[in-house]
UniProtKB/Swiss-Prot annotation:
GO annotations of cellular component type: mitochondrial membrane; respiratory chain complex I
Protein name as catalogued: Probable intron-encoded endonuclease 4
Organism: Neurospora crassa (strain ATCC 24698 / 74-OR23-1A / CBS 708.71 / DSM 1257 / FGSC 987)
GO biological process: ATP synthesis coupled electron transport; electron transport coupled proton transport; intron homing
Family membership noted in the UniProt record: In the N-terminal section; belongs to the complex I subunit 5 family. In the C-terminal section; belongs to the LAGLIDADG endonuclease family.
Membrane topology: Multi-pass membrane protein
Cellular location(s): Mitochondrion membrane
Catalytic activity, EC: 3.1.-.-
Length: 545
């Protein structure tokens, strides 16, 4: 049983990686998921057997290094600490595998991804169960290699390759210190076996013990991206921030978790308390304890688009200036993501009656950072005027002389502006009609952007999207509507620049219908039932509003 815990994820990875074309996408998904789930079940059994009964299990497979100076065995130790650590590692890995089936369903390289993911799990198990430092180092390096492979999963993207290389090289700093610590242990005790080291530890010179401890600590800090060695983490988000690097994905963006508004409100309260604690420690109302660098242009343009829809530049009656984004509380996770990416600002409950949260920035230095983002990069006419007045007020209040840059920016399908604007002002709809000429059904899909005023801007968006602009008198604004036959460029766009709010849930159902319609499978009775199911999910969803 204990060997199965170690071997099963490796077998799943080998099958998905080397025989992916034979077993197919579904086969690779099924084999890797089953191997990890079975491993999790076995680990739970091991937890009861070893943890409760306190009966450690040691497996020595073979001698790895055998010399007159030292002996290293390829062995594994299952004690109370090991099985306790295996439980969260394998449960989380199982959930990641299962969720990735739908999350990566549109990617053509599923087999490779699931192979990497199972290999990651295998290396984690090696890291946790090894009974000596050298074998632990093998698992340690394996986790680093798998992280590199996952971050650079889309290897045709330069940013992904740069991000993976940054993560890989930064982790080598930690590996260097870990290796030094291991050599000091070997030089001092002549053995790397845990049992030997722990039994002789009380007799080691205190200075040497301190050196060993510091080296091992720095190694762990680099691997877990702690202070000073965290610089690779923001770039590592490039690989799977928007798709499938789920072990580094912000949990508040998880579309499955987003389906539970009650749980989401609870998460928001936890975030509020965490923000308060961090603010208290740092003696600051806005600067977070771990500032993420704004390096990726995708976030910059997504953020600008989102703010043009839902943000505001406020000149308060009391004289202070403020930047604010307001969202309903069930969608507050996007505000926490923005705060995390920018590295400053406050997210808090705004209105208990209307159930809203807001992201707010008032600090002068952070407002200057926001000015550098928006100045000259705003598209909507009304937002340009608002920003210009706000910037003039800022210069007067703080006696600054920041020039206003007239914006000539025009959105296109080569940056994330439209994704952000859609998260704020877009929706996806589906209608099913009877065909009067025959028994077949007509399925109508639409992508809609809405905005009050800004007629010329909406006309431009209609032009680049291949849609039409409609005047809505009751709304005193305009809709840009793109119908089924013109949706292909938009679908390709959202594959490159995915939505970040819970509208992704609606889009996920909508795109399934789109694929059936494009493949002309929508009139199959079974598929028609699926379409009606997806349609109901779209139309009843609050996330599409």
């Amino acid at each position: 049983m204990y060997l199965s815990i170690i071997i099963l994820p490796l077998l799943g990875s080998i099958v998905a990686g080397f025989f992916g074309r034979k077993v197919g996408v579904s086969g690779a998904q099924l084999i890797t998921c089953l191997s990890v789930i079975i491993t999790t079940g076995l680990a739970i059994l091991a937890f009861f057997e070893v943890g409760f009964n306190n009966i450690p299990v040691t497996i020595n497979l073979f001698r790895w290094i055998d010399s007159e100076w030292y002996n290293i065995l390829w062995g594994f130790q299952f004690d109370s600490l090991t099985v306790a650590m295996l439980i969260p590692v394998l449960i989380i890995s199982s959930l990641v595998h299962i969720y990735s089936i739908s999350y990566m369903s549109h990617d053509p390289h599923n087999q490779r991804f699931f192979s990497y993911l199972s290999l990651f799990t295998f290396m984690m198990i090696i890291l946790v169960t090894a009974n000596n430092y050298l074998l632990m180092f093998v698992g340690w390096e394996g986790v680093g290699v798998c992280s590199y492979l996952l971050v650079s999963f889309w290897f045709t993207r330069i940013a992904a390759n740069q991000s993976s290389m940054s993560a890989f090289l930064t982790n080598r700093v930690g590996d260097c210190f870990l290796t030094i610590g291991m050599f000091v242990v070997l030089w001092t005790l002549g053995n790397l076996d845990y049992a030997t080291v722990f039994s002789l530890a009380p007799y080691i010179n205190s200075d040497i013990a301190t050196i060993i401890g510091i080296c091992l600590l720095i190694g762990a800090m680099a691997k877990s991206s702690q202070v000073g060695l965290h610089v690779w983490l923001p770039m590592a988000m490039e690989g799977f921030f928007s798709r499938a690097f789920l072990k580094l994905h912000y949990m508040q963006e998880h579309p499955v978790l987003s389906l539970g508004p009650l749980r989401f409100s609870l998460f928001g309260k936890i975030q509020d308390q965490g923000q308060f604690a961090g603010n208290s420690i740092r003696s600051s109302s806005e600067i977070t304890s771990e500032a993420f660098m704004l390096k990726e242009s995708w976030f910059k343009w997504w953020f600008i688009g989102f703010v043009e829809g839902d943000g505001s530049f406020i000149i308060n009656k009391d004289g202070y200036l403020e930047f604010r984004i307001t969202q309903s509380s069930p969608d507050a996770q996007i505000l926490f993501m923005i705060k995390k990416e920018l590295g400053f600002g406050v997210v808090r409950k705004q209105d208990s009656v209307r159930n809203t949260h807001c992201y707010r920035v008032r600090d002068k230095n952070n407002l200057i950072k926001l000015i550098s983002i928006f100045n000259g990069n705003i598209f909507l006419d009304t937002r340009k005027e608002q920003f210009k007045l706000w910037l003039n007020a800022f210069n007067l209040k703080y006696k600054e002389n920041i020039p206003h840059i007239d914006s000539s920016f025009r959105p296109n399908l080569d940056n994330a502006w439209l994704s952000g604007f859609t998260d704020a002002e877009g929706c996806f709809t589906c209608s099913v009609y009877d065909n009067k000429s025959n028994t077949a059904k007509l399925v109508r899909l639409r992508y809609i952007l809405s905005q009050k005023g800004n007629s010329s801007c909406m006309e431009y968006l209609a032009e680049i999207l291949g849609g039409k602009k409609h005047l809505l008198k009751s709304y005193e604004g305009y809709n840009v509507t793109v119908n089924t036959t013109k949706l292909s460029p938009i679908v390709q766009y959202f594959n490159l620049y995915p939505l970040k709010t819970k509208k992704y849930i609606t889009y996920f159902n909508w795109i399934k219908i789109y694929k059936l319609v494009i493949d002309k499978k929508h009139n199959d009775p079974e598929n028609l039932l699926l379409i009606m199911k997806y349609k109901n999910n779209i139309n009843k969803s609050d996330y599409n509003k």
